[in-house]
Amino acid sequence: MTDTPTRIYVDADACPVKDEIYRVALRHSVPVSVVAGNFIRVPQDPLIERIAAGAGMDAADDWIAERARPGDVVVTSDIPLASRCVKAGADVIAPNGKPFTEQSIGMTLAVRNLMTDLRSAGEVTGGPRSFAPRDRSTFLSALDQTLRRIQRRRIDAAATSQNSSQG
């Protein structure tokens, strides 16, 4: 855990829960970087910054992956980006509320790659299910719990550090 404050990075181009992220972030006083390849409208608030990462295919993903670190939260449905951020130590949540973890990301990435191969071979024609109202609720709960967990880890780390310096 680092001493720099927690930040939420949003892979924003197709993110259906941006408004929910803003509400939770403002309630917790956590800064948000809304990263997109194109212009995207964000609320006027000092805690919310818009990042135009450029038009390159993975420009937004690269921008986020280069900055994500332990204590940060990344919101993305992009599985390769999620993998990079999990490896960097960030907490990663999909817009449907599903967490990507060190334990789950390998299998998730393998399934994604398999489905991509099957689609390109014409074996699978459907995609993921549609975003549902319950996904929004699950996401809100997951983001709030993740921010609380990070805050507890910071408090515990500070207490441990203080105790070891006294002992």
Swiss-Prot record:
Q: Which domain of life is it from?
A: Bacteria
Enumerate the InterPro entries for this protein. UPF0178 (IPR003791)
**Family indicated by similarity:** Belongs to the UPF0178 family.
Q: What name goes with this protein?
A: UPF0178 protein bll3966
Q: What is the lineage of its organism?
A: Bacteria, Pseudomonadati, Pseudomonadota, Alphaproteobacteria, Hyphomicrobiales
